[in-house]
């Protein structure tokens, strides 16, 4: 794979800082410290002083693509990889066998050999100590190959399933990268920029960055929509080495002059396929055009459709690629897939039946997918009235409520979460034992993505799907996915096989979900002795529905 990216000339460059930020102390890092500042003519303007409690002035400017002059830009270090003697000593046959065992395929030239342990990665002690403190037994497949790639300073593509350890694959090399750069000065933007499709994923990435960056005093902020801008603006003005952002809110900050990307030398596009599915391609391109072209760019994705390949060709320079598993669309073989062909009116009682079985184990967590926000609320209200500990999460919920719902679900205080696709994207909750497709998704890619929330990390899981005649065009693709995973296909579903309806599997963008259905007919008033509404200040709508007598 060879991507060509010729870059135009420029006459930009960094301006000098206006008064330095205090050093972070004790970072050590690669490449001999971070002493000198950037030279160059000083920036005019910069951030104006903010009087106590004063408002930020929001003067928007249209972003234009700079003309880059690489010769005038300050040099920076991005290759920190020194191969461990154990890695060097391995034969080509041993390396090939390791990659085969981990379903690892590579593409490109001069690709570093994979590592097999944390010590072989060559991380400094402050990173290794944190890894050991977190109790990770060994690197995942994507980390074994991704860390040497990222630490070598190369542009790279990493393709692996959600939940495979991609976040640490770029987070830890990013921390090493930061510690080798000069300190931020007043008015500087971040050094590492991570773009993510959803606020939930962005917040999860921030958690990992905070955890592993604390010992180096690396600051970060999370910039996303649906939350007040003030705290995000203050973080950016105070200076952060890492900015994790959703594309839309970051564009707002850039156009309002609240930050800049002149210092970014390490760019991450996480869940690139999902960002394109959600229509963020214009924003991504506008953002990346603001970053110096000799940066290091890392693209991470669960799939490799043509749209993502085109983005890689445009913005990655001679990249190397690692893929864990097959590029063919497939479901994990650790997931038991159960598909029931039903009518709309049968769904509610069948859901309760499956919940009774699933929650017989008190450690179970059940994620239920609904196609619309309305259905999501209706399912949740019914379940709560019937005594089930369910909470809803969707796009109409305020961010603080979404955070609370996720916390309750993660901790097991509420073992059922009902979600829409958009709300669930980027959510990584450990220990989900069951996924229920109350409504089928609009395309087979989303089906595989949904059920992949269970059966992670070698654990087993169960996916239950209610299939109606409205989804008959999905039948052939669904049979193909189940057949590949060696699942039992019910005769009722086989009637919808591709032999009758044709295959609709695509590897590009999804086709969008079905429109919402009308509401249920009500079922008389729940079971007596309701428990009152949700917790004050957090819950709204269906999440405040009284909880009936416990079903278990």
From Swiss-Prot:
GO function term, MF aspect, one: ATP binding
Motif DEAD box: chain residues: 270-273
EC number per UniProt: 3.6.4.13
Domain (Helicase ATP-binding): residue spans on this chain: 147-322
Highest taxon listed in the record's lineage: Eukaryota
Domain Helicase C-terminal: start-end pairs: 337-497
Alphabetical list of Pfam families matching this protein: DEAD (PF00270), Helicase_C (PF00271)
UniProt binding sites for ATP: 160-167
Broad class of where this protein is predominantly found: cytoplasm
InterPro entries: DEAD/DEAH_box_helicase_dom (IPR011545), Helicase_ATP-bd (IPR014001), Helicase_C-like (IPR001650), P-loop_NTPase (IPR027417), RNA-helicase_DEAD-box_CS (IPR000629), RNA_helicase_DEAD_Q_motif (IPR014014)
SMART domains linked: DEXDc, HELICc
Location of the protein in the cell: Cytoplasm; Nucleus
Keyword rRNA processing among UniProt keywords: yes
UniProt biased composition (Gly residues): 515-539
Ranges for region Disordered: 504-552
Residue window of motif Q motif: 116-144
Keyword list, A-Z: ATP-binding, Cytoplasm, Helicase, Hydrolase, Nonsense-mediated mRNA decay, Nucleotide-binding, Nucleus, Ribosome biogenesis, RNA-binding, rRNA processing
Cellular component annotations (GO), alphabetically ordered: cytoplasm; nucleus
PROSITE patterns: DEAD_ATP_HELICASE (PS00039), HELICASE_ATP_BIND_1 (PS51192), HELICASE_CTER (PS51194), Q_MOTIF (PS51195)
One Gene Ontology term from the biological process aspect of the record: rRNA processing
Catalytic activity: ATP + H2O = ADP + phosphate + H(+)
Family per record: Belongs to the DEAD box helicase family. DDX5/DBP2 subfamily.
Subunit structure, as described in the record: Associates with polysomes.
Its job: ATP-dependent RNA helicase involved nonsense-mediated mRNA decay and ribosome biogenesis through rRNA processing.
Record text about domains: The Q motif is unique to and characteristic of the DEAD box family of RNA helicases and controls ATP binding and hydrolysis.
Protein name: ATP-dependent RNA helicase DBP2
Organism: Lodderomyces elongisporus (strain ATCC 11503 / CBS 2605 / JCM 1781 / NBRC 1676 / NRRL YB-4239) (Yeast)
């Amino acid at each position: 794979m060879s991507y060509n990216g010729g870059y135009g000339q420029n006459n930009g460059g960094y301006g000098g800082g206006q008064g330095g930020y205090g050093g972070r102390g004790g970072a050590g890092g690669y490449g001999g410290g971070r002493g000198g500042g950037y030279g160059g003519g000083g920036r005019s303007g910069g951030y104006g002083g903010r009087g106590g409690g004063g408002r930020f002035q929001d003067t928007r400017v249209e972003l234009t693509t700079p003309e880059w002059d690489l010769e005038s830009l300050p040099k920076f270090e991005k290759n920190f990889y020194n191969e461990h003697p154990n890695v060097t000593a391995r034969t080509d046959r041993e390396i090939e066998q390791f990659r085969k065992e981990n379903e690892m395929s590579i593409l490109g030239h001069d690709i570093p050999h994979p590592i097999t342990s944390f010590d072989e990665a060559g991380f400094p002690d402050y990173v290794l100590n944190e890894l050991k403190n977190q109790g990770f037994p060994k690197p995942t497949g994507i980390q074994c190959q991704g860390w040497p790639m990222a630490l070598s300073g190369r542009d790279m593509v990493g393709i692996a399933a959600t939940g495979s350890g991609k976040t640490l694959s770029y987070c830890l090399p990013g921390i090493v990268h930061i510690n080798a750069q000069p300190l931020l000065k007043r008015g500087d933007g971040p050094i590492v920029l991570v773009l993510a499709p959803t606020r939930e994923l962005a917040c999860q990435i921030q958690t990992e960055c905070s955890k592993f960056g604390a010992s180096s005093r690396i600051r970060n902020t999370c910039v996303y929509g649906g939350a007040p801008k003030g705290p995000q603006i203050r973080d950016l003005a105070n200076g952060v080495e890492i900015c994790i952002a959703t594309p839309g809110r970051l564009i707002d900050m850039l156009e309002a002059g609240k930050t800049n990307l002149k210092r970014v030398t390490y760019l991450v596009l996480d869940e690139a396929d999902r960002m394109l599915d959600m229509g963020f391609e214009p924003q991504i391109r506008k953002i990346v055009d603001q970053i110096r072209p000799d940066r290091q760019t890392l693209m991470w994705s669960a799939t490799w459709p043509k749209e993502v390949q085109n983005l890689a060709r445009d913005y990655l320079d001679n990249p190397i690629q690692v893929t864990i598993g097959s590029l063919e669309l497939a479901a994990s073989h650790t997931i038991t897939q159960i598909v029931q062909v039903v009518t709309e009116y049968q769904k509610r009682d069948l859901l309760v039946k499956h919940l009774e079985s699933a929650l017989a184990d008190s450690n179970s967590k059940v994620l239920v997918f609904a196609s619309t926000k309305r259905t999501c609320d209706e399912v949740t209200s019914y379940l709560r009235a019937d005594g089930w500990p369910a909470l809803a999460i969707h796009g109409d919920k305020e961010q603080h409520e979404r955070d609370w719902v996720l916390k309750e679900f993660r901790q097991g205080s509420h073992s059922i979460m009902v979600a829409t696709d958009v709300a669930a994207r980027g959510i990584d909750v450990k220990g989900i034992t069951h996924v229920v497709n109350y409504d089928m998704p609009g395309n087979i890619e989303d089906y595989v993505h949904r059920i992949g929330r269970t059966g992670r990390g070698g654990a087993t899981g169960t996916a239950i799907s209610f299939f109606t005649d409205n989804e008959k065009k999905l039948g052939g693709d669904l049979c193909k996915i189940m057949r590949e995973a060696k699942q039992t296909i019910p005769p009722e579903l086989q009637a919808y096989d591709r032999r009758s309806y044709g295959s609709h599997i695509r590897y590009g963008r999804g086709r969008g979900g079905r429109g919402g259905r009308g509401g249920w007919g009500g079922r008389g008033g729940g079971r007596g002795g309701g428990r009152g509404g949700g917790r004050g200040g957090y819950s709204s709508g269906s999440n405040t529905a009284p909880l009936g007598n416990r079903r278990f």
